[in-house]
A protein has these predicted regions:
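Conserved glycine-rich cofactor-binding loop
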Residues: 17-19
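Rossmann-fold cofactor-recognition segment
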Residues: 53-71
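Conserved mid-core segment of classical short-chain dehydrogenase/reductases
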Residues: 88, 94-110, 153
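Active-site helix of classical SDR
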Residues: 124, 160
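C-terminal helical subdomain
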Residues: 184, 199-236
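Conserved glycine-rich Rossmann-like NAD(P)H-binding loop of the short-chain dehydrogenase/reductase
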Residues: 32-48
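Residue(s) in the substrate-gating loop at a strand-loop-helix junction
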Residues: 144
Length: 251
C-alpha cells in the first residue's frame, strides 16, 4: 500500500533501464526509501540502474523480462509480485526503430509491433488481473504524441504506439471502480539514448520533465497527460487537419 503521504512503497518498472521510467521512479518516491523491481533483459545497464537505486537507499529487485516473448510474461509478472503487492507499475519499454529499414524488412517491423503493442497488451492484462485482485494500485503507461496521429515519417512506430495508447485508455475504463487507476502519458520528443543522434523537434523535453508530468497525473488521477502540456493543443489541431494538408506537412 502507499504510505501515509501517498507515496508508493513498492514499484514495478517494466523497462527497467528506461531513462524516463527511472526518472519517474525517483520523482514519485521523492527521496523516501521504497522497494523497486526492475524488469528488463539482463544487462550491464540493468545492473547499473539497480546499483544506483540501492545507493540512494532503495531495496531493489531484478526480474528478467523479454518483451518479444509474450509467452514468458505471466512468469515475469508472477516473479515481480512474489515479494508482495505492487502499488505502482510503470510500463516504459519500447523501441523507435528505423523507418526506412523497416519499409524493406517486414520482419523488423513486426518485431517492433510486438515490443511496442503486443507486449504492452500482454503485460497490461497480467497487471490488471493482479492489481484488481489486490484491490489497489496504479499503472503509468508511457505512450507518445506520435500515437495520436501517426506521421508518414514514422508511421510504423506511430501505429504500434497508437495501439498501445488505445489499449491502456480502454484498460483504464475496464478497471474503473476497481481501486486501480491507469494514466496514459504522451511525451513529445525526449532527450534519451533512444533519440540520440536524431533531429530534435519543437518543445523537446528531458526525462525529468516527463517524470514530473507523470507523477502529477498519478497524484491527480488524470487519465491522460501530455509532456510538455502545450502539446495537447498542438496535437488537437494536427488530429483534425484534412488528410491532404497533413500529408504535406514536413513532419
Amino acid at each position: 500500500m502507499n504510505d501515509a503521504t501517498g507515496t508508493p512503497q513498492r514499484i514495478l518498472l517494466l523497462g527497467g533501464t528506461s531513462e524516463i521510467g527511472l526518472a519517474i521512479v525517483r520523482r514519485v518516491v521523492r527521496g523516501r526509501p521504497a522497494e523497486v523491481v526492475l524488469a528488463a533483459r539482463p544487462s550491464e545497464r540493468r545492473t547499473a540502474a539497480a546499483t544506483a537505486l540501492t545507493a540512494e537507499g532503495h531495496r531493489v529487485g531484478e526480474v528478467d523480462f523479454e518483451a518479444t516473448a509474450p509467452a514468458t510474461h505471466p512468469a515475469t509478472i508472477d516473479a515481480a509480485f512474489d515479494g508482495g503487492d505492487v502499488d505502482l507499475a510503470i510500463v516504459a519499454f519500447g523501441v523507435l526503430g528505423d523507418q526506412e529499414a523497416m519499409l524493406k524488412d517486414a520482419a523488423a517491423a513486426a518485431e517492433l509491433a510486438t515490443v511496442n503493442y503486443v507486449a504492452g497488451v500482454s503485460v497490461g492484462l497480467e497487471l490488471a488481473g493482479r492489481l484488481r485482485s489486490q484491490g489497489h494500485g496504479a499503472i503509468l503507461a508511457l505512450s507518445t504524441v506520435a500515437a495520436e496521429r501517426p506521421r508518414r515519417s514514422n508511421f510504423v512506430y506511430g501505429s504500434s504506439k497508437a495501439g498501445f495508447d488505445a489499449f491502456y485508455s480502454g484498460l483504464a475504463d475496464e478497471l474503473h471502480g476497481s481501486g486501480v487507476h491507469v494514466s496514459v502519458i504522451r511525451p513529445g520528443f525526449v532527450r534519451t539514448r533512444m533519440t540520440a543522434g536524431r533531429e530534435e523537434a519543437p518543445m523537446t523535453v528531458e526525462a525529468d520533465d516527463v517524470a514530473e508530468v507523470a507523477v502529477e497525473a498519478l497524484q491527480r488521477r488524470k487519465p491522460v497527460a501530455w509532456a510538455p502540456g502545450p502539446l495537447r493543443w498542438v496535437m488537437a489541431v494536427l488530429r483534425h487537419l484534412p488528410r491532404p494538408v497533413f500529408r504535406r506537412l514536413p513532419i
